[in-house]
Design a protein with these regions (language model features):
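Short coil/turn helix-boundary motifs
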Residues: 10, 39-40, 115, 156
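Cyclic nucleotide-binding regulatory domains
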Residues: 9, 35-96
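Hydrophobic residues at beta-strand termini and immediately following loops
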Residues: 28-30, 70
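Polybasic "coupling" helices that flank or enter modular domains
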Residues: 93-96, 101-158
Length: 158
């Protein structure tokens, strides 16, 4: 998925603003099994999935608990690291060979103060993530694992 498609999923940005954002991105490839984000580390980058699938998990009592699966177009960020500059609790592992766009957190924050459209995109992203988190929480509290899996397949059929 092209970066323009990824960005415009959240907020349609003028080309000039999108070009400013594009200039700060680097495209990278990683193999299946690579940990894009690691628990216990302060992450300095944000990733967008151009091609691939990722799972986010945390460990509890020696077990990995997957709480999110992302596909092409998804954004990978440790919110704890992004917001508070603290080590994150999640690990994000690639489920197949993948191509990602990488954006340094400090560059994004600078763009927020320089470009209103990029700042509005960031605000919209935060709003959408809050809604998605709320939906996951309600789902986890109200459904057994098989029901959650069925719901995932219905929402994300590909």
């Amino acid at each position: 998925m092209d970066i323009k498609e990824i960005i415009n999923q959240r907020y349609a940005m003028p080309d000039a603003s999108l070009d400013r954002l594009r200039q700060c991105l680097t495209e990278v490839s990683y193999p299946k099994g690579f940990h894009v984000l690691e628990s216990g580390k302060i992450e300095k980058d944000i990733f967008f999935i151009k091609k691939g699938i990722v799972r986010a998990y945390t460990s509890a009592d020696g077990k990995e608990i997957t709480f999110w699966v992302g596909k092409e177009g998804a954004t990978l960020v440790s919110m704890k690291g992004y917001v508070n500059d603290e080590p994150g609790y999640e690990t994000m592992e690639l489920m197949e060979d993948s191509v990602l766009y990488v954006l340094e957190r400090k560059k994004l924050k600078a763009l927020f103060s320089e470009d209103l459209h990029i700042a509005n995109w960031g605000r919209r992203y935060a709003e959408m993530e809050l809604l998605a988190t709320e939906e996951r929480l309600i789902s986890m509290l109200s459904a057994i694992a098989s029901e959650r899996y069925k719901e995932l397949l219905e929402k994300e059929p590909d």
